[in-house]
Amino acid sequence: YRVFVDKWATVKPMSAAERRAIETFLDEANNLDQLMKRSAKLLADLTKQVAVITYPITGEGSGSEKMTISGTANLARSGEDLGTSLSPILEALEEQVVLLRLLGDANDTVKVRIGGEQSESNLRQTSLVTVGYGAAESPVGALGILGPTRMDYAGSMAAVSAVARYVGRYI
């Protein structure tokens, strides 16, 4: 999968209709909590994977320890692609510190970790696609998706990138 992902590393653009749908959906958020929850739901729906979003770091340095997750049920739909029991993956998802560590090095470039490239042993049957959001050179938060190693990488990378761009505009 790594060769494929590296070969197709350029993120395919989303259609104008998809971009409008994202913008309209996120425009309906009235506060930060709604924006984060709607963004996670949107990302999970677009990719059919588990979406994780950290809250932005505020001026006081807080926020990055808070996150929202959506689409955990999508793991059950791709159970055969994961090759193992879902229990270790679900355990890792419940550990907020694990997720914060996985998203902690996200920057303004989409990053893909596949299978054994994961630092967390419970997630070695999965792939993680992450990116930071906020100002281009200094992201204030991160978002990503977690799913089986057999996923639509090009589509997932495009969705992660697009949602990050829109969330960054609203922050």
What do these predicted ranges mean?
Residues R2, D6-I171:
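Intrinsically disordered, acidic Ser/Thr/Pro-rich low-complexity regulatory segments
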